[in-house]
């Protein structure tokens, strides 16, 4: 049995890997898979990691890139909340006190909060700060699913809850960041057939239809 150890953030493991792992195991039944979910990044100098998924921009210390998933960042909320709020402008999102923003601690150094999102969209005015904060992005996403407010959504990361209707992408500008979810392997190691198979499987995914989100802003 071939062993494969994969490291990813808690949110990526929870929302992207776990819902889809059955398909990889069906494709590669001979691979014994171990998933390490952690938000504190550590290069694999002192432990055995075959592959990692990290959000940001290269270089990543001790690692090299073998694949990437592009992202769009857009406000998301529960469908019932989207229906109640109706059509919104960016100014509405910034100023209306009945639109509760949800924020979280960063699982990655370049992760955006609301202040960063507004800034990168070119918003120069003030905005209502988030009233609900979580130490985990997974908790922030679940709070949005439960109707507690509006969270920032990374569309590849949240592809499953967006597809199954637990979350709705709001009709607001989508941000196209330079950062990606990168598939990484240790610098001094050649990719094994299992690593190559996992990288292909992860990168293939479901392509994100760019027309699904309006007014994309590249930064």
Residue ranges and their predicted role:
Residues 2-61, 215-219:
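Central regulatory/effector-binding core of bacterial HTH transcription factors
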Residues 5-7, 52, 76, 102, ...:
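Short, well-ordered beta-strand segments
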Residues 10-11, 79-80, 138, 156-157:
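Alpha-helix/helix-capping structural signal
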Residues 11, 108, 188-189:
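Short, surface-exposed acidic/glycine-rich loop or hinge patches that mediate macromolecular interfaces
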Residues 13-16, 60, 111-120, 134, ...:
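Tryptophan-centric aromatic hotspots in well-structured domains and transmembrane helices
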Residues 30, 155-168, 173-219:
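C-terminal effector-binding regulatory domain of bacterial HTH transcription factors
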Residues 34-110, 115-133:
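Acidic, Gly/Pro-rich loop/turn segments at junctions of secondary structure
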Residues 123-170, 176-177, 191:
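Hydrophobic hinge/microswitch elements
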């Amino acid at each position: 049995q071939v062993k494969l150890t994969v490291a990813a953030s808690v949110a990526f493991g929870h929302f992207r890997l776990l819902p889809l792992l059955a398909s990889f195991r069906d494709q590669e039944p001979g691979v014994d898979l171990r998933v390490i979910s952690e938000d504190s990044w550590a290069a694999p100098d002192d432990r055995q990691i075959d592959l990692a998924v990290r959000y940001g921009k290269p270089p990543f210390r001790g690692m090299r890139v073998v694949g990437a998933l592009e992202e769009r960042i857009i406000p998301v909320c529960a469908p019932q909340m989207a229906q109640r709020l109706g059509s919104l402008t960016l100014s509405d999102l910034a100023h209306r006190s009945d639109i509760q923003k949800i924020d979280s601690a960063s699982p990655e150094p370049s992760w955006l909060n609301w202040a960063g999102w507004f800034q990168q969209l070119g918003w120069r005015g003030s905005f209502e700060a988030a009233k609900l904060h979580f130490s985990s992005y997974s908790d922030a996403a679940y709070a949005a699913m439960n109707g507690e407010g509006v969270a920032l959504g990374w569309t590849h990361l949240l592809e499953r809850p967006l597809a199954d209707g637990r979350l709705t992408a709001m009709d607001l500008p989508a941000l196209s960041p330079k950062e990606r979810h990168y598939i990484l392997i240790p610098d001094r190691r050649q990719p094994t057939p299992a690593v190559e198979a996992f990288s292909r499987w992860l990168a293939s995914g479901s392509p994100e239809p760019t027309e699904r989100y309006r007014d994309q802003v590249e930064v």
